[in-house]
């Protein structure tokens, strides 16, 4: 689960981290009143969406007068903001964050995330802040891996401070900040805490100017405050609906629908489709409790995406019996108008029975595939016809 910048900064404050004063607003009048309340002569007017790259997309403006606050708020509120992370469809801006201006001397990048390969916490830092970290040269980035059983230590912070060429005073301030961020990361079940930029002010303080946080959905049951920060408007409606049926669905931008059981097989199926020149339209794991009704619902959700030109069903029957999937496919054809080709590869428990069920149904656009690669190739070929 992701949250907005204004919510992330609320959490930063909860953990004793100094951030600039700001107020979330939903109207132009509120934006103007917020700027007056904050005081000063410079304000940042920031679109609040769950995506990075807002500045480049025109979603962050620096106002040097109340008239400019009003002007920028009018332009940004209600706009469809397109960034590298939103995709071409963009996101509608419904909220703004009005933040008091900061005297910036230098910008850095700092983040904490989970390193799955090394099974540790990775602290990533760079002296090139304020831009996408993916675009920064590798030799300008330092990654410090922290053993969770040991935790953050002075030498971790010193290594980062040395890499960033900070003086003694700032090195101490960085360690204090990192210690608080590390505690925030652990105690909120985060999977990402990204500060970009972390700014050095002209007053010689280190201040998070922007903050992005993501959380482990499976831990939200013990994070009531964070769970209440969920903004349904920022999430894909089909993904939310899928969850209510026990389906794990993520919309992508390809044209080949995927229905698979098991996250690992789903990833392998998507890789195979990519490998034979196709592009998946979604990730969909029907899970271990799939029945004909949930399979039919999965078809319905996949087919809402008008970009889908074929569907590849790849099931290895274990907990999920293949005959259940076959009956679900037939149920879907009754409940939903399935006009695109459906390529079906079934293996494992009751695979023979499933093949017979589909054969007896004699539906022309349901095509059996003998193996994964053949099914992927057929899906790509039929999608491109």
Curated annotation (Swiss-Prot):
InterPro entries: ATP-grasp, ATP-grasp_succ-CoA_synth-type, ATP_grasp_subdomain_1, Succ-CoA_synthase_bsu_CS, SUCC_ACL_C, Succ_CoA_ligase-like_bsu, Succinyl-CoA_synth-like. ATP binds at residues 46, 53-55, 99, 102, 107. Binds 1 Mg(2+) ion per subunit. Keywords: ATP-binding, Ligase, Magnesium, Metal-binding, Nucleotide-binding, Tricarboxylic acid cycle. One of its GO terms (cellular component) is cytosol. It catalyses: succinate + ATP + CoA = succinyl-CoA + ADP + phosphate; GTP + succinate + CoA = succinyl-CoA + GDP + phosphate. Its EC number is 6.2.1.5. GO terms for molecular function: ATP binding; magnesium ion binding; succinate-CoA ligase (ADP-forming) activity; succinate-CoA ligase (GDP-forming) activity. It is an enzyme of class 6 (ligase). The keyword Nucleotide-binding applies. Substrate binds at residues 261, 318-320. Its cofactor is Mg(2+). Residues 9-241 form the ATP-grasp domain. Pathway: Carbohydrate metabolism; tricarboxylic acid cycle; succinate from succinyl-CoA (ligase route): step 1/1. NCBIfam families: PRK00696.1 (NF001913), sucCoAbeta (TIGR01016). Belongs to the succinate/malate CoA ligase beta subunit family. HAMAP family: Succ_CoA_beta (MF_00558). Heterotetramer of two alpha and two beta subunits. This is Succinate--CoA ligase [ADP-forming] subunit beta. The gene is sucC.
């Amino acid at each position: 689960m992701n949250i907005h910048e204004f919510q992330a900064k609320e959490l930063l404050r909860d953990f004793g981290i100094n951030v600039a004063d700001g107020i979330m607003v939903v109207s132009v009048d509120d934006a103007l009143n917020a700027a007056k309340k904050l005081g000063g002569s410079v304000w940042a007017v920031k679109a609040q969406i769950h995506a990075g790259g807002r500045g480049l997309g025109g979603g962050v403006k620096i106002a040097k007068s109340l008239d400019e606050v009003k002007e920028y708020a009018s332009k940004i509120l209600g706009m469809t903001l397109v960034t590298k992370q939103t995709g071409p469809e963009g996101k509608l801006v419904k909220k703004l964050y009005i933040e008091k201006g900061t005297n910036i001397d230098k910008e850095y990048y700092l983040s904490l995330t989970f390193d799955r390969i090394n099974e540790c916490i990775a602290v990533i830092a760079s002296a090139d802040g304020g831009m996408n970290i993916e675009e920064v040269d590798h030799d300008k980035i330092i990654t410090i891996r922290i053993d969770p059983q040991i935790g953050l230590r002075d030498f971790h912070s010193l290594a980062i401070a040395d890499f960033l060429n900070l003086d003694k005073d700032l090195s101490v301030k960085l360690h204090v900040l990192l210690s608080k961020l590390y505690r925030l990361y652990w105690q909120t079940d985060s999977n990402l805490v990204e500060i970009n930029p972390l700014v050095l002010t002209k007053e010689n303080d280190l201040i998070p100017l922007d903050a992005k946080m993501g959380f482990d959905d499976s831990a939200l049951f013990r994070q009531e405050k964070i769970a209440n920060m969920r903004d349904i408007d920022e999430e894909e409606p089909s993904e939310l609906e899928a969850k209510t049926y026990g389906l794990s669905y993520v919309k992508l931008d390809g044209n080949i629908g995927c229905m698979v059981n098991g996250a690992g097989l789903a990833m392998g199926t998507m890789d195979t489709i990519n490998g034979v020149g196709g592009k998946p339209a979604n990730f969909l794991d029907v899970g271990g409790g799939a029945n004909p009704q949930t399979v039919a619902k999965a078809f319905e959700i996949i087919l809402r995406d008008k970009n889908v030109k074929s569907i590849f069903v790849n099931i290895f029957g274990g907990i999920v019996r293949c005959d259940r999937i076959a009956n679900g496919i037939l149920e879907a054809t009754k409940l939903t108008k399935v006009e695109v080709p459906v390529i079906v590869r079934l293996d494992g428990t009751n695979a023979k029975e499933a093949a017979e069920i589909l054969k007896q149904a004699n539906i022309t656009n349901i095509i059996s595939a003998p193996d994964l690669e053949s099914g992927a190739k057929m899906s790509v070929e039929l999608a491109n016809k």
